[in-house]
């Protein structure tokens, strides 16, 4: 099998949440536990840091990985979803897993996998953990896929757990209140393993304290610590300030655990995060005139901060190219759109996309003037054609809109 034949096989044979949604979601860990047994317990073969949260867990994971890389540690990084290439999910020192390793893993385990009814995410976790163990990483930063308690990554016993914040997202799976969602994400808190909470919230603080007490897990609230200033970083989204604070507090705690992380390593980790880890799609400027920015924010909380930052920018016209998936509360998101923005609606190229006719109806219900397009590239082209040098074009609403955009760049 070639690499592309391998991916075609996996996409066709294994249910993938990012593409099809609920049909691929499993509410238990048994398949992952069975997979780890088949692979001879790779999750026990490397040290790790486990990162959950509604927003910011991807950026935080990349920042922590970058700091460890600057300190000279061989650093694994597992994140999801990918934007362009599946291998973005699995990296060591910023380098994607080789294509032949992916193909080799699938070919050698294909028969066993077919009997286990694995999801795409379970399979990718198995590949990542097997790869990190075989390559003898010093540490792996592992981002939760969704939730925490029942996420496939939750077979780890890490050095440190991080929960960035709790908001309303994936409520059909994790619960319809912030408290219920916090309960799910708190499932990554392990016996005697310290946990850093990025944001203390009235509805969740008691839940985290109760569970950490039950687990004898030291708990640190990052926003109770106020750094004089943050290190320089190419990550310019206003929402990153909370992630910076969470990362700094986590790094300081890891230093106390004995990891050789100096202030210089931390500072350089922030400054070189994009270069070290190839993080993309976080308030990423793709063009200067007119300015084109993309961001993977995809829920009300994340897009509220994005819209505020766009509104504050000096500009002539604001052009918004937006598309969504079909399991988000899009009506609430559409209320955030500035009334003076020029709106281009589109449909990302995945089965889980919110169909353009439904999005057009929702926008009309909100009295939003708009034009609509069947794909992201056409919407972006229209925005570019209508713009002058002093305008700002923002592309987002979904990770998969950004993925479609970047795949053409």
Question: What is the predicted function of each stretch?
Answer:
Residues 1-53, 60, 66, 70-71:
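Short functional linear segments
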Residues 64, 149-159, 405-409:
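Short Gly/Thr/Asp-enriched flexible loops that form oxyanion-binding sites at enzyme active sites
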Residues 64-69, 132, 254, 363, ...:
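Hydrophobic alpha-helical packing residues
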Residues 148-150, 157-216:
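Conserved catalytic-core segment of NTP-binding enzymes
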């Amino acid at each position: 099998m070639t690499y592309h034949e391998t991916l075609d096989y996996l996409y066709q044979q294994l249910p993938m949440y990012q593409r099809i949604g609920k049909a691929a979601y499993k509410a238990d860990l048994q398949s992952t536990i069975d997979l780890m047994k088949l692979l001879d317990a790779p999750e026990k073969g490397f040290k790790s840091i486990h990162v959950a949260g509604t927003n910011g867990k991807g950026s935080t994971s990349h920042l922590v990985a970058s700091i460890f890389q600057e300190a000279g540690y061989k650093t694994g990084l597992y994140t999801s979803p990918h934007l362009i290439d599946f291998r973005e999910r699995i990296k060591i020192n910023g380098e994607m897993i080789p294509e032949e390793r992916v193909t080799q893993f699938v070919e050698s385990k294909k028969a066993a996998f077919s009997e286990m009814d694995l999801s795409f995410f379970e399979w990718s976790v198995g590949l990542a953990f097997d790869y990190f163990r075989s390559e003898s990483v010093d540490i792996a930063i592992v981002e939760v896929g969704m939730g925490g308690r029942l996420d496939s990554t939750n077979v780890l016993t890490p050095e440190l757990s991080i929960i960035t914040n709790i908001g309303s997202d994936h409520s059909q799976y994790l619960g319809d209140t912030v408290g219920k969602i916090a309960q799910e994400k708190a499932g990554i808190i392990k016996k005697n393993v310290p946990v850093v909470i990025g944001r203390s919230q009235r509805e969740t603080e008691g839940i985290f304290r109760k569970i950490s007490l039950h687990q004898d897990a030291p708990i640190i609230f990052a926003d109770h610590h106020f750094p004089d200033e943050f290190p320089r970083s190419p990550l310019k989204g206003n929402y990153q300030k909370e992630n910076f604070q969470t990362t700094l507090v986590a790094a300081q705690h890891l230093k106390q655990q004995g990891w050789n992380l100096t202030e210089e390593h931390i500072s350089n980790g922030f400054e070189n995060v994009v270069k070290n880890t190839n993080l993309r799609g976080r308030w990423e400027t793709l063009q200067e005139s007119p300015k084109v920015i993309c961001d993977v924010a995809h829920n009300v909380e994340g897009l509220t901060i994005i819209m505020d930052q766009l509104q504050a920018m000096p500009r002539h016209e604001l052009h918004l190219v937006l598309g969504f998936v079909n399991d988000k509360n899009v009506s609430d998101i559409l209320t955030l759109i500035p009334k003076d923005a020029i709106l281009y609606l589109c449909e990302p190229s995945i089965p889980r996309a919110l169909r353009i006719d439904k999005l057009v109806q929702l926008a009309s219900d909100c009295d939003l003037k708009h034009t609509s397009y069947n794909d992201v590239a056409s919407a972006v082209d229209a925005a570019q054609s209508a713009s002058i040098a002093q305008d700002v074009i923002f592309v987002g609403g979904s990770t998969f809109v950004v993925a479609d955009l970047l795949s053409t760049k």
